[in-house]
């Protein structure tokens, strides 16, 4: 699990606390505050952010009144939505959300972060279990096909 934390620069302190809480839960998280590779060139920055979001498993959006003036937060959400990344919002002071963000789960305190991580880990385990089951079925299908080939070759 790797979480991209999207936030307005005015919310960097809260985003850092969220980053710390995720790390305490053994979750890899990206926060631009700790990124020495950030550049001021808008084209390079855009590509850098796109790569970071693409290489994340989730996006956590810090929502505050400042977010309403952000250009980058909606951009990052758009990249994540395009990839169908699981998205959660962290509401600062119960800010009212734009309608398009109302769909995703809302974290309202630091106590919600372990709940988010637990739910996400449980879902990832289910997906892994289903994948293992699919691989096993595929393997059985192959071995069944191989058995068919062997029988047919013997009969021919």
Across the structure, where does each feature detected by a protein language model lie?
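Short low-complexity, flexible loop/linker segments enriched in glycine and/or proline
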Residues: 43-47, 76-77, 102-106
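C-terminal interaction surface of TIR/SEFIR-family domains
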Residues: 3, 13, 94-156
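Conserved TIR/SEFIR loop-to-helix hotspot centered on a Trp-containing motif
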Residues: 65-83
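Short beta-alpha junction loops
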Residues: 65-66, 91-97
């Amino acid at each position: 699990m790797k979480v991209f934390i999207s936030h307005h620069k005015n919310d960097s302190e809260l985003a850092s606390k969220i980053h710390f809480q995720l790390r305490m839960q053994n979750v890899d998280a990206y926060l631009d505050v700790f990124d020495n590779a950030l550049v001021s060139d808008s084209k390079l920055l855009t590509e850098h952010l796109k790569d970071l979001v693409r290489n994340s498993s989730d996006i956590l959006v810090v929502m505050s009144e400042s977010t309403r003036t952000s250009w980058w937060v909606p951009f990052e959400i758009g990249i994540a939505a395009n990839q169908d990344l699981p998205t959660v919002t962290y509401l600062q002071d119960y800010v009212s959300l734009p309608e398009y963000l109302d769909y995703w789960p809302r974290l309202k305190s630091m106590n919600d972060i372990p709940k988010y991580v637990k739910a996400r880990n449980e879902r990832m385990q289910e997906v892994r279990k289903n994948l293992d089951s699919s691989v096993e079925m595929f393997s059985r299908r192959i071995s069944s096909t191989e058995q068919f080939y062997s029988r047919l070759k013997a009969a021919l």
